[in-house]
Swiss-Prot record:
Function: Catalyzes the conversion of (8S)-3',8-cyclo-7,8-dihydroguanosine 5'-triphosphate to cyclic pyranopterin monophosphate (cPMP).
Binding site for substrate: M74, C75, H76, M110, E111
Active-site residue list: D125
Family: Belongs to the MoaC family.
Listed pathway(s): Cofactor biosynthesis; molybdopterin biosynthesis
Record's keyword annotation contains Chloroplast: no
Gene name tied to this protein: moaC
GO molecular function annotations of the record: cyclic pyranopterin monophosphate synthase activity
Pfam families cross-referenced by the UniProt entry: MoaC
EC number(s) given by UniProt: 4.6.1.17
Biological process terms in GO annotation: Mo-molybdopterin cofactor biosynthetic process
Protein's name in the database: Probable cyclic pyranopterin monophosphate synthase
Complex formation: Homohexamer; trimer of dimers.
Length: 155
């Protein structure tokens, strides 16, 4: 049977990490947002009415990484050493990659995942008017594949 460290007697609780040593940690998370070709072109050309989409998404992701413990209840507040946010355009999508680094008592994967999620949501928010069809729906727009692609500890 799987043991969950965040549950004790059926109650949610924050795990006690106070006795753990500080260790260098890094996490890399990625995810994609699928968009219409015209929307991708507008982002590339810098012609989106709301402004620079990727610059805004980069700032939003960084802020989200720093605020992760405020929105995920059992996530510890950790000293972040670095956050990098990059975007790659593929065939019909933009991929966000967030790298988080810390020297602390617990991992930084939740921060990286939160950063990717908010980056992609910010992109959606900035281009939603271009993505809607005549019925106000989003037939192409899709966020998927949010995952941790790498986690390092002690290097």
């Amino acid at each position: 049977m799987v043991e969950f460290t965040h549950i004790s007697d059926g109650r949610a609780q924050m795990v006690d990490i106070s006795a753990k040593p500080d260790v260098v940690r890094e996490a890399v998370a990625q995810g994609r947002i699928y968009l219409r070709p015209a929307t991708l072109a507008a982002i590339r050309e810098g012609s989106v009415v709301k402004g620079n989409v990727l610059a805004t998404a980069r700032v939003a992701a960084t802020l989200a990484v720093k605020d992760t413990p405020r929105i995920i209840p059992m996530c510890h507040t950790i000293p972040l050493g670095a956050v990098t946010v990059d975007f790659t355009e593929g065939d019909g999508y933009i991929e966000a990659t967030v790298v988080t680094k810390s020297t602390g008592k617990t991992g930084v994967e939740m921060e990286a995942l939160t950063g990717v999620s908010v980056a992609l949501l910010t992109i959606w928010d900035m281009v939603k008017s271009a993505e809607k069809d005549e019925n106000g729906q989003y037939p192409v727009t899709c966020i998927e594949g949010i995952r941790v692609v790498e986690k390092k500890k002690g290097q």
